[in-house]
């Protein structure tokens, strides 16, 4: 009887991310923007574990250019009510800095003022964020309850590990 040598078979389990969250070239531009502009006064005090973000590219106003949501989810950017999210245009110019947000974020196909309606759950109820005068409302906790109890079945779900897992980048 001849025994064949045992072969180790390595299985590589690769994370599956939503494609709108994976763009290493864009991530490098975002890192530069965060370090040299948006967080330039904070960067020296940020711990290594706080230097993480996720992003999601989506065209909110049908202009053919993706806006970019940046999700800050580490301790430095989060408080008891939620975390900071940033919305940038395609040129990395700020549109809205959201405070106290707890993803997932729902982007509806319905538009108001030419931009997608956003929904976020806050204190157990959905809040509608509508674009007005160049930005979205920055603090959903002060908004009234949305006129409906759930997002539509057509909403795009952002920053959800179940529906749109986002790649984590460090800077």
Where are the model-predicted features located?
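Acidic, small-residue rich beta-repeat scaffolds with periodic aromatic anchors
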Residues: 1-25, 108-171
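Flexible low-complexity loop/turn motifs enriched in small/helix-breaking residues
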Residues: 2-60, 65, 166-171
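Beta-propeller blade repeat segments, especially FG-GAP/WD-type strand-to-loop junctions
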Residues: 16-27, 31, 80-97, 128-135
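Short consensus segments that form the blades of beta-propeller domains
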Residues: 44-46, 75-80
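Acidic/hydrophobic-patterned starts of short beta strands in beta-sheet-rich repeat architectures
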Residues: 62-73, 112-120
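Short, flexible beta-strand-to-coil junctions
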Residues: 72-76, 90-92, 120-125
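A short, surface-exposed interaction/processing loop segment used at functional sites
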Residues: 86-104, 139-147
């Amino acid at each position: 009887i001849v025994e064949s040598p045992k072969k180790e078979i390595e299985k590589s389990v690769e994370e599956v991310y939503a494609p709108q969250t994976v763009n290493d070239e864009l991530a490098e531009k975002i890192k530069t923007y965060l370090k040299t502009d948006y967080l330039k006064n904070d960067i020296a005090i940020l711990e290594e574990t706080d230097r993480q973000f996720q992003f999601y590219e989506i065209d909110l106003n049908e202009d053919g250019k993706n806006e970019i949501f940046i999700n800050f989810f580490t301790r430095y950017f989060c408080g008891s009510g939620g975390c900071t999210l940033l919305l940038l245009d395609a040129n990395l110019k700020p549109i809205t800095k959201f405070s106290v947000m707890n993803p997932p974020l729902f982007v509806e196909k319905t538009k108001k003022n030419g931009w997608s309606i956003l929904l976020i759950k806050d204190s157990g109820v959905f809040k509608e964020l509508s674009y007005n005068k160049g930005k979205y409302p920055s603090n959903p906790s002060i908004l009234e309850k949305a006129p409906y109890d759930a997002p539509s079945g057509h909403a795009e779900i952002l920053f959800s590990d179940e529906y749109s897992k986002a790649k984590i980048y460090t800077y």
